[in-house]
């Protein structure tokens, strides 16, 4: 492996900013001679210049958490201060890239070193300086114009899906003294020069932002548009909004990763940031393998999904401390695209691994442990992460709205939801998609348990549904009632058997089975069912509930007459209708199209009505 090509830190005041290693304990290093350093300042530890961050200061002693393997660091090694907090580079080139937890570009490092491992102390800029981007300045901006933080002063077509808007960093303002003409520039070329109070400042297309700091916005707005996931059980029963927070807790093998990957593939978001935090490396390689092949249709053109996705990979065999950084890196990238006016979804898979990293570092610092050994500030850290979600009015001109939705997978040990991470998360998030091991063992996927899951956004979304799908809200209420009734009846059935139930109860059981097997269950690996558009979800639910209502009415109306209609008579006479109801999910939205599917469902509804009429006559 040739390390000579990798750049080292070069700093004029290098000697003035040097402390010395005093002790090493795993990823935690103590350094002396650090007077004047700041909390969360970035430092370089040892002769290999390992990346670290100051997490505690006492006198001239600093405690540093190192984001790389510390073997070989010895007492007396230099600790170089950079004077900057841990920051990320924000600019063209993020989409389609894969970074590690501290935004080092993995593909660039592998090209440089010809190795599958990241060498220690590597210092490669996150965004390539060699690529030229086609920059177009804003039409209404000229020399002498006034410009303030968040204003868009140019556009770069990053790819055919993402128009990358070049914004002025939030804290800058001034009068334009130079703006670059349209043309090809790389990320180190100056494209804008401002003067403010006699001081001139130059700007490139890249801005640097500290990861622990929230990017400012004009105001936070209430969320009112659903995040459509393409999973029927989530869209119909437990919807999330664009700008919402969601937790997916579940034991191993329940399908958390499949749900978060299908969200990344099919949800109605403009940008996806997928953070693999302490999960298996195979899952990230699966994403890298699947996403470039997956396509979506935009304005009649077929595009690769990878063009709207950025990956932050911090697998379980990478240093523990960097897991914490990867979550912050991911959310900062999300906020940057939100500020352009995009709807961003961030998948964090999984926040439990992040909490475990906090626990390990906290243990090394000899802090007082709380529940299960986690630090006392676990809840505060989780809250400060989830609170960065939301729908906002972005800073600067032109006026625009953006949102960040956070979907956090949680892996409680043994599937125990009373685990501190799960209970702290549930106190913060608004949507809970609880995965059930028993459903997963019965091969019922997505294994979302409809009895324990909930969404607090249903009220906020009622207005949207009333406007676009008027019949949907009562349908959802009815479906939940049927599923709840079925759960109550299940105990009676086990005691006395199905035969001794009332006719209406038999119908409830039958329709609940229909809803569970042919509506809530969904095969994510088939072309017809991997993504279910909302019109198809509503159409299917509408016919199933209509079937329930008609059956119930038929049984109740003829209960006193001589020719009683019972559950078994309906089942014998309507086997074809039942078969068509169970086959509704096989309609392919891509091949058949919306008009044909809606017409087929309407036809089925008509045939159902006619069948019940003739049965009653």
Curated annotation (Swiss-Prot):
GO terms for biological process: ATP metabolic process; cellular response to increased oxygen levels; intracellular iron ion homeostasis; proton transmembrane transport. Ubiquitously expressed (both isoforms). It catalyses: ATP + H2O + 4 H(+)(in) = ADP + phosphate + 5 H(+)(out). Keywords: ATP-binding, Cytoplasm, Hydrogen ion transport, Ion transport, Nucleotide-binding, Translocase, Transport. GO terms for molecular function: ATP binding; ATP hydrolysis activity; proton-transporting ATPase activity, rotational mechanism. Its main location: cytoplasm. ATP binds at residues 250-257. The keyword Transcription regulation does not apply. ATP hydrolysis occurs at the interface between the nucleotide-binding domains of subunits A and B. ATP hydrolysis triggers a conformational change in the subunits D and F, which induces a shift of subunit d. The c-ring is subsequently rotated and results in a continuous proton translocation across the membrane. CDD domains: ATP-synt_V_A-type_alpha_C (cd18111), ATP-synt_V_A-type_alpha_N (cd18119), V_A-ATPase_A (cd01134). One of its GO terms (cellular component) is vacuolar proton-transporting V-type ATPase, V1 domain. It is an enzyme of class 7 (translocase). It is found in: Cytoplasm. Its EC number is 7.1.2.2. PROSITE patterns: ATPASE_ALPHA_BETA. Catalytic subunit of the V1 complex of vacuolar(H+)-ATPase (V-ATPase), a multisubunit enzyme composed of a peripheral complex (V1) that hydrolyzes ATP and a membrane integral complex (V0) that translocates protons. V-ATPase is responsible for acidifying and maintaining the pH of intracellular compartments and in some cell types, is targeted to the plasma membrane, where it is responsible for acidifying the extracellular environment. PANTHER family: V-TYPE PROTON ATPASE CATALYTIC SUBUNIT A. V-ATPase is a heteromultimeric enzyme made up of two complexes: the ATP-hydrolytic V1 complex and the proton translocation V0 complex. The V1 complex consists of three catalytic AB heterodimers that form a heterohexamer, three peripheral stalks each consisting of EG heterodimers, one central rotor including subunits D and F, and the regulatory subunits C and H. The proton translocation complex V0 consists of the proton transport subunit a, a ring of proteolipid subunits c9c'', rotary subunit d, subunits e and f, and two accessory subunits. Belongs to the ATPase alpha/beta chains family. This is V-type proton ATPase catalytic subunit A.
């Amino acid at each position: 492996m040739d390390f000579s090509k990798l750049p080292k830190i070069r700093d004029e005041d290098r000697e003035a900013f040097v402390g010395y290693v005093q002790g090493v304990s795993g990823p935690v290093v103590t350094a002396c001679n650090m007077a004047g350093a700041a909390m969360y300042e970035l430092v370089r530890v040892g002769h290999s210049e390992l990346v670290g961050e100051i997490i505690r200061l006492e006198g001239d002693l600093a405690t540093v958490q190192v984001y790389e393997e510390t073997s070989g660091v010895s007492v007396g090694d230099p600790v170089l201060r950079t004077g900057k907090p841990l920051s990320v580079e924000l600019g063209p080139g993020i989409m389609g890239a894969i970074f590690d937890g501290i935004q080092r570009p993995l593909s660039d490092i592998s090209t440089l070193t010809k190795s599958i491992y990241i060498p220690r102390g590597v210092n490669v800029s996150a965004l390539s300086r060699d690529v030229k981007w086609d920059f177009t300045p804003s039409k209404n901006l000229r020399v002498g114009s006034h410009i303030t933080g968040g204003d868009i002063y140019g556009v770069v077509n990053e790819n055919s899906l993402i128009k990358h808007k070049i914004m002025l960093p939030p804290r800058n303002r001034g009068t334009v003294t130079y703006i670059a003409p349209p043309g090809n520039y790389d990320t180190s070329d100056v494209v804008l020069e401002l003067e403010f109070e006699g001081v001139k400042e130059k700007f490139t297309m890249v801005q640097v932002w500290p990861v622990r700091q929230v990017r400012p916005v004009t105001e936070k707005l209430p969320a009112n548009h659903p995040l459509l996931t393409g999973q029927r059980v989530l869209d119909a029963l437990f919807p999330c909004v664009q700008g919402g927070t969601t937790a997916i807790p579940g034991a191993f093998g329940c399908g958390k990763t499949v749900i978060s990957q299908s969200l990344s593939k099919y949800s109605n978001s403009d940008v996806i940031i997928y953070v693999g935090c302490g999960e298996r490396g195979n899952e990230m390689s699966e994403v890298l393998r699947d996403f470039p092949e997956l396509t979506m249709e935009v304005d009649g053109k077929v595009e690769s999904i990878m063009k709207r996705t950025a990956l932050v990979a911090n697998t379980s065999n990478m240093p523990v401390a960097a897991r914490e950084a990867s979550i912050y890196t991911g959310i900062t990238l999300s906020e940057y695209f939100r500020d352009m006016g995009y709807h961003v979804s961030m998948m964090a898979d999984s926040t439990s691994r992040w909490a475990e990293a906090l626990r390990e570092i906290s243990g090394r610092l000899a802090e007082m442990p709380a529940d299960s050994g986690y630090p006392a500030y676990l809840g505060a850290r989780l809250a400060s992460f989830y609170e960065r979600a939301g729908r906002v009015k972005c800073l600067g001109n032109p006026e625009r709205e953006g949102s960040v939705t956070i979907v956090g997978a949680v892996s409680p040990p043994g599937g125990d939801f009373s685990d501190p991470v799960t209970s702290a998360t549930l106190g913060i998030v608004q949507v809970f998609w609880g995965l059930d091991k028993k459903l997963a063992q019965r091969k019922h996927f997505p294994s979302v348990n409809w009895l324990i899951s909930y969404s607090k956004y249903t009220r906020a979304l009622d207005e949207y549904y009333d406007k676009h799908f008027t019949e949907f809200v009562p349908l959802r209420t009815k479906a939940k009632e049927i599923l709840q009734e079925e759960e109550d009846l299940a105990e009676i059935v086990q005691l006395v058997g199905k035969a001794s139930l009332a006719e209406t109860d038999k119908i409830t059981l039958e329709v609940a089975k229909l809803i569970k097997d042919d509506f809530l269950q969904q095969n994510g690996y088939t072309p017809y069912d991997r993504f279910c558009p909302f019109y198809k979800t509503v159409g299917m639910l509408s016919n199933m509930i209509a079937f329930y209502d008609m059956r119930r009415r038929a049984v109740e109306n003829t209960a006193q007459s001589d020719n009683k209609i019972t559950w078994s008579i309906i089942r014998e006479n309507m086997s074809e209708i039942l078969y068509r109801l169970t086959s509704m999910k096989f309609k392919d939205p891509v091949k058949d199209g919306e008009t044909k599917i809606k017409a087929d469902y309407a036809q089925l509804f008509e045939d159902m009505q006619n069948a019940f009429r003739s049965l009653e006559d």
